[in-house]
Swiss-Prot record:
Pfam families per UniProt: Glyco_hydro_1
Active site residues according to the UniProt entry: E199, E413
Protein name (record): Beta-glucosidase 16
Catalytic activity: Hydrolysis of terminal, non-reducing beta-D-glucosyl residues with release of beta-D-glucose
Gene label: BGLU16
Tissue: Expressed at low levels in cauline leaves and flowers.
EC top class named in words: hydrolase
GO BP terms, alphabetized: carbohydrate metabolic process
UniProt EC number: 3.2.1.21
Similarity annotation: Belongs to the glycosyl hydrolase 1 family.
Keyword Ligase: no
Length: 514
């Protein structure tokens, strides 16, 4: 009897080992030397999401302060970024975390209103803000971490919104140029990678079409409680001004600073990757149009000096602005690298073009969905918009290479969220799976010949996630918002540490290999 029991126990044990091994084998096993020797690994945050100290040391309000504090109902949990991760006061601890994990670089943004509280040079420079960023940059360099700086990550000074409508005003372009030049002057001796704008498409889409993000504008027929707006015209004006602002910032950097500071400058663009809903010709064209209205919307002007033909042919009634010959020339080649922010993929379905209630979204004549025949494109994350589909990052990189003359690329954001369950949770195997599968796809793209130079995980730590507030967590580091903003390394941070030291990554959770 005892022998039968031991035999049964052995069979159960072997079966469990087999299941565990099967799960383990689904995660790619990566080493740092699977990537080029000079490949940069880093992590990323943004100013409003993590700095806090929103009303301290002379910082002026941004549109995100106004949006979240005056209209808390527009944030899922009624929160704001006034304290956030308190990185303004805890930056040394954050730099130590980057060093401890083993990252080469840190991508962060500068709060425009922290150094120019009224948004303009005429309104005065806040020396305390300059000092903060000098201290952060110097601390990073002292730990061997490269600063990779974004100039504008959505937090426009509120003074400019009030003065001329912010991104809707032509004045924005020159004000951004002046702000960018101030940053080049103050920090460019140490900062060698600059990003002008982060995700201009998100600013256009969620700030002026859906109204989900500051300044919260949309058409009344879309959402009656929007703070004004016209989603048929304003998005195109905003996108145009953002492109021109990018162009003038790159121009001043190249003409006055690049030769001596020896840095490089680019832009960070985002999109889901779009797959045809069916094999029909109409749906294949719809997938192309969907990308034209998101990623190509900004790539086409900065590579070729024009808007994508799909936009030109679909946006009626003169609503799509045009570039002057001088503007077109300025925009052509206005990058040393392109940042790619990728999280998820979608199916694109051709639909009839709208004849009423027109928005920039309806102009594309595409319906974007996350499932086909009842089957999601990939497993769901903490946010309903994030369906996990690693192959999309490779296909997006290939698109950038072959349509846009093989540019230098960085993955400037890639990550996954989980719901905030209200207690310390460090065993984030889902996040490890996400990173492993996406990094494998990046490695595959490099082996095909895509010129990817680096990868930044979003995010270094849990932070204020815009309209979702603190209801979801993207971080490699857990932040306890109830206990002094204490930081704890999650399992994913330790996985990265092993990867960056050359060990295989991997535990026993799985995500479908796609």
């Amino acid at each position: 009897m005892r022998g039968k029991f031991l035999s049964l126990l052995l069979l159960i044990t072997l079966a469990c080992i087999g299941v565990s091994a099967k799960k383990h084998s689904t995660r790619p096993r990566l080493r740092r030397n699977d990537f080029p020797q000079d490949f940069v690994f880093g992590s990323a945050t943004s100013a409003y999401q993590c700095e806090g100290a929103a009303h301290e040391d002379g910082r002026g309000p941004s549109i995100w302060d106004s949006f979240s504090e005056k209209f808390p109902e527009k944030i899922m949990d009624g929160s704001n970024g006034s304290i956030a991760d308190d990185s303004y006061n805890l930056y040394k601890e954050d730099v130590n975390l980057l060093h401890q994990i083993g990252f080469d670089a840190y991508r962060f943004s500068i709060s425009w209103s922290r150094i120019l509280p009224r948004g303009t040079l005429k309104g005065g420079i806040n020396q305390a803000g300059i000092e903060y960023y000098n201290n952060l940059i110097n601390q990073l360099i002292s730990k061997g971490v490269k600063p990779f700086v974004t100039l504008f990550h959505w937090d426009l000074p509120d003074a400019l919104e009030n003065a001329y409508g912010g991104l809707l005003g032509d004045e924005f372009v020159n004000d951004f140029r002046d702000y960018a030049e101030l940053c080049f002057q103050k920090f460019g001796d140490r900062v060698k990678q600059w990003t002008t704008l982060n995700e201009p498409y998100t600013m256009v889409h969620e700030g002026y079409i859906t109204g989900q993000k500051a300044p919260g504008r949309c058409s009344n027929f879309y959402k009656p409680d929007c703070l004004g707006g016209d989603a048929a015209t304003e998005p195109y004006i905003v996108g145009h001004n953002l492109l021109l602002a990018h162009g003038v910032a790159v121009k001043v950097y190249r003409e006055k600073y690049q030769a001596t500071q020896k840095g490089e400058i680019g832009i960070a663009l985002n999109t889901a990757w779009h797959y045809p809903y069916s094999d029909s010709y109409a749906d294949r064209l719809a997938a192309t149009r969907a990308t034209a209205f998101t990623f190509d919307y900004f790539m086409e002007p900065i590579v070729y000096g024009r808007y994508p033909i799909e936009m030109v042919s679909h946006v009626k009634d003169g609503r799509l602005p045009t570039f002057t010959p001088e503007e077109s020339e300025m925009l052509k080649g206005s990058y040393d690298f392109i940042g790619v922010n990728y999280y998820s993929s979608l199916y694109a379905k051709d639909v009839p073009c709208a004849t009423e209630n027109i928005t920039m979204t309806t102009d594309s004549c595409v319906s974007l969905v996350g499932e086909r025949n009842g089957v999601p494109i990939g497993p769901a994350a903490g946010s309903d918009w994030l369906l996990i589909y690693p192959k999309g990052i490779r296909d997006l990189l290939l698109h950038a290479k072959f349509r846009y003359n093989d540019p230098v690329l960085y993955i400037t954001e890639n990550g996954v969220d989980e719901a905030n369950i209200g207690k310390i949770f460090l065993n984030d195997d889902l996040r490890i799976d996400y990173y492993a599968h996406h990094l494998k796809m990046v490695s595959d793209a490099i082996s095909i010949g895509v010129n990817v130079k680096g990868y930044f995980a979003w995010s270094l730590m849990d932070n204020f996630e815009w309209s979702e507030g603190y209801t979801v967590r993207f971080g490699l580091v857990f932040v306890d918002f109830e206990d002094g903003r204490k930081r704890y390394l999650k399992k994913s941070a330790k996985w990265f540490r092993r990867l960056l030291k050359g060990a295989h990554g991997g535990t026993n959770e799985q995500v479908a290999v796609i």
